[in-house]
From Swiss-Prot:
The lineage of its organism: Eukaryota, Metazoa, Chordata, Craniata, Vertebrata. It comes from Mus musculus. CDD domains: STKc_CK1_delta_epsilon. Expressed in all tissues examined, including brain, heart, lung, liver, pancreas, kidney, placenta and skeletal muscle. Expressed in monocytes and lymphocytes but not in granulocytes. SMART domains: S_TKc. It comes from the Eukaryota. This is Casein kinase I isoform epsilon. Pfam families: Pkinase. GO terms for cellular component: cytosol; growth cone; neuronal cell body; nucleoplasm; nucleus; ribonucleoprotein complex.
Amino acid sequence: MELRVGNKYRLGRKIGSGSFGDIYLGANIASGEEVAIKLECVKTKHPQLHIESKFYKMMQGGVGIPSIKWCGAEGDYNVMVMELLGPSLEDLFNFCSRKFSLKTVLLLADQMISRIEYIHSKNFIHRDVKPDNFLMGLGKKGNLVYIIDFGLAKKYRDARTHQHIPYRENKNLTGTARYASINTHLGIEQSRRDDLESLGYVLMYFNLGSLPWQGLKAATKRQKYERISEKKMSTPIEVLCKGYPSEFSTYLNFCRSLRFDDKPDYSYLRQLFRNLFHRQGFSYDYVFDWNMLKFGAARNPEDVDRERREHEREERMGQLRGSATRALPPGPPTGATANRLRSAAEPVASTPASRIQQTGNTSPRAISRADRERKVSMRLHRGAPANVSSSDLTGRQEVSRLAASQTSVPFDHLGK
């Protein structure tokens, strides 16, 4: 029995899940185009899908912003259909043995700064900048970095007057402790500067393989957050970035020097890394480390040049166009769940790909490194989506649980 959504999309197998819903592979019945379909039970205690869809709709038109194809209710479910995306940068980082080359880090930095700038231009801060929340596109957009998960996003200024939110302290804060800014740890209201500081830690994570405040032991998670905060504040930027080009320490020092309501100079930060890129003699061929593992050889120069031109055109037209989305959750619903959705007489088409184990920022529990790399490699070759990270459906509620340092859930300000 075929399960349909909006009488337009075929519901396939579950490919991910989150705190507030499940994500399925789907397909447009007419065109066959694969999509991601998020389902949330309408009876859930804290409905989030409608809020999330509103954020995505507000962001539509920017390069690297997943496009929304359909939203509505189907039986007992709230539904959001999005364009399908590939693996997250965390997936790819693990695939590349948890180390990126300088070239790959700089290629990513350029796009990631632009994604954050775009969100800020729409009057929101993301508040959960981490590798899991950046995904690569699929097919022709395989070299484009997308930003996802607005579950923790917040409006930082009025859309009409641009009046900035007031400075506050002693906040119960949300975010991911590993990449949180120092001001976030101190309980200060987040603003644009904090998204960019978090990105600085992400870039050094890609350079180093891990950050000095990873793996800290503590009796409770609350104490672990305190230790992360202490270690982060006691590690000078120059020590963190030692052995790497000075641009990385310059970037972090710049972010930390910003005042609460300052508008960051995004162009300056991009240019820092672009100048370094050119001095290193790198080429904007968009060959990332995982491409080398995928193909094992250099690509045709004509293909490289064509992709470069397409990427530049996408960036120029970013304010006028929308783009893609990420994969959603294993196996279609059965029994009572299936009966709540419309059905048709045709058989369910089989869907590709075994799941990629979501590793967060630690080695996978259930599969070996070799098995994980084999599965990611299969997806890279076949253009299949990666499994979504659990943070994709993270809610904005002040939930009571305290998560591990790499998990994006609200965490209490420890200094209160």
